[in-house]
């Protein structure tokens, strides 16, 4: 796949043990009505309906994975298969539609889709049980390699402070802090993705990022950032706190797309380092933006810089209004609707932003077909056409 490409907008109806306390939900479910977890058909039907995704198979150039769909759940050795690309995402009822679209986009553009292994982290007390969520993923992606883990919210609930936006206070938002504890020890490297992204390029390119030196994470970063906007006046006026980060380069990065070395993460006790800042936040308010500031305090200036094409973030607008945004200049491999506005919500409310139509071809929600019957297709031909149109600036 070339570095620059055209993403065709297709017809809307086309099928395109630490204290964390986790439990594993079997990924291979044969019956939607399997009643475990209190969900059954009832909980399942409330979340759907989703169309079954097309089968995406490896090309001849792919190294065959040793994962067997019939037994990979119980085999920890399968997680250590060097041919696998490991991706971690959260899974909950509110963002389920986004998660399904994200998975679909990864598989559609992956050069070796059968070698992609998803690790889904589900909340213990979500309105849809983790078992029901697992069933829905299996029915939508019958051949997908994945595991579902239950994240106990009491692991982090007492460390969470109020934020600028209520959604940022969701305990599942902090699951990324605990991936080193949640995932099998045999998983030594993982890509973390937020649920409001789609990829339009081969995820293997991101997976192949080299974390040089002792770097623990890689992400698109923006240096020379104004850090005063990420921390409160109480932080900057404290006689000691600013000095703790004075030697770090002021580099901002979005934690919705990260390549993580879990071996270095575990060895460096980075979960504890993040928690220390969260504990301080409970005593004195030093930031307002949820789970991001602790990452900046711990990692800023020591992140492996990844091409900005791998996180075109901010497409959900700001945290208050969720206004429409345009793409950043340059090529695009991943689009990220961080911010208040989510494409599936705006599309359903018939007030989409122009870039939301780039997300829609990956949407497997069945009700979108009914909506498409009442809408004429927009005249957008490609991603490049959207970025070149001055009306989106």
UniProtKB/Swiss-Prot annotation:
List the GO cellular component terms. Golgi membrane
What are the disulfide bonds?
none
Designated name of the protein: Probable galacturonosyltransferase-like 8
Q: What are this entry's molecular-function GO terms?
A: polygalacturonate 4-alpha-galacturonosyltransferase activity
Spell out which residues lie on the membrane's Lumenal side. Answer: 26-393
Organism of provenance:
Arabidopsis thaliana
Q: What does the similarity note say? A: Belongs to the glycosyltransferase 8 family.
Protein localization: Golgi apparatus membrane
Q: Which residues lie on this side of the membrane: Cytoplasmic?
A: 1-4
Q: Tell me the membrane topology, using the record's own terms.
A: Single-pass type II membrane protein
A single BP term in Gene Ontology: pectin biosynthetic process
Glycosylation sites noted in the Swiss-Prot or TrEMBL record: 226
- Gene3D superfamilies of this UniProt entry? Spore Coat Polysaccharide Biosynthesis Protein SpsA, Chain A
Q: Give the EC number(s) under which this enzyme is classified.
A: 2.4.1.-
Q: What does this protein do?
A: May be involved in pectin and/or xylans biosynthesis in cell walls.
**Is Glycoprotein given among the entry's keywords?**
yes
Which chain regions cross the lipid bilayer?
A: 5-25
Its keywords, alphabetically, are: Cell wall biogenesis/degradation, Glycoprotein, Glycosyltransferase, Golgi apparatus, Membrane, Signal-anchor, Transferase, Transmembrane, Transmembrane helix
Known pathway? Glycan metabolism; pectin biosynthesis
């Amino acid at each position: 796949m070339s570095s620059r490409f055209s993403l065709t907008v297709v017809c809307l109806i086309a099928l395109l043990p630490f204290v964390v306390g986790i439990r594993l939900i079997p990924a291979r479910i044969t019956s939607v009505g399997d009643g475990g977890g209190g969900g059954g058909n009832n909980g399942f039907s409330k979340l759907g309906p989703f169309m079954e995704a097309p089968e995406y198979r490896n090309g001849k150039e792919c190294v065959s994975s040793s994962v067997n769909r019939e037994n990979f759940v119980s085999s920890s050795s399968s997680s250590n298969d060097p041919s696998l690309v490991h991706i971690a995402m959260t899974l909950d009822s509110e963002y389920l539609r986004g998660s399904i679209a994200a998975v679909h986009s990864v598989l559609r553009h992956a050069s070796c889709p059968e070698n992609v292994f998803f690790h889904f982290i589900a909340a213990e007390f979500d309105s849809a049980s983790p078992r029901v969520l697992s069933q829905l993923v299996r029915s939508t992606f019958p051949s997908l390699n994945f595991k579902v883990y239950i994240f106990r919210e009491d692991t982090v609930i007492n460390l969470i402070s109020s934020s600028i936006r209520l959604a940022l206070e969701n305990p599942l938002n902090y699951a990324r802090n605990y991936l080193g504890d949640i995932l099998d020890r045999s998983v030594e490297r993982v890509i973390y993705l937020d649920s409001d992204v789609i990829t339009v390029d081969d995820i293997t390119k991101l997976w192949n990022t080299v974390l040089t030196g002792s770097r623990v994470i890689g992400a698109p970063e923006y240096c020379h950032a104004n850090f005063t906007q990420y921390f409160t006046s109480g932080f900057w006026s404290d006689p000691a706190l600013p000095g703790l980060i004075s030697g770090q380069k002021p580099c901002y990065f979005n934690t919705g797309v990260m390549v993580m070395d879990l071996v270095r993460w575990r060895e460096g006790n980075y979960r504890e380092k993040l928690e220390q800042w969260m504990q301080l936040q409970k005593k004195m308010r030093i930031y307002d933006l949820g789970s991001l500031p602790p990452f900046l305090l711990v990692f800023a200036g020591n992140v492996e810089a990844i091409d900005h094409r791998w996180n075109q973030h901010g497409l959900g607008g700001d945290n208050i209004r969720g206004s429409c945004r345009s793409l950043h200049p340059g090529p695009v491999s991943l689009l990220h609707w961080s911010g208040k506005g989510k494409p599936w919500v705006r599309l359903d409310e018939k007030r989409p932003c122009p870039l939301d139509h780039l997300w829609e071809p990956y949407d497997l929600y069945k009700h979108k077909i009914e909506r498409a019957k009442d809408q004429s297709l927009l005249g957008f031909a490609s991603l490049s056409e959207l970025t070149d149109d001055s009306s989106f600036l």
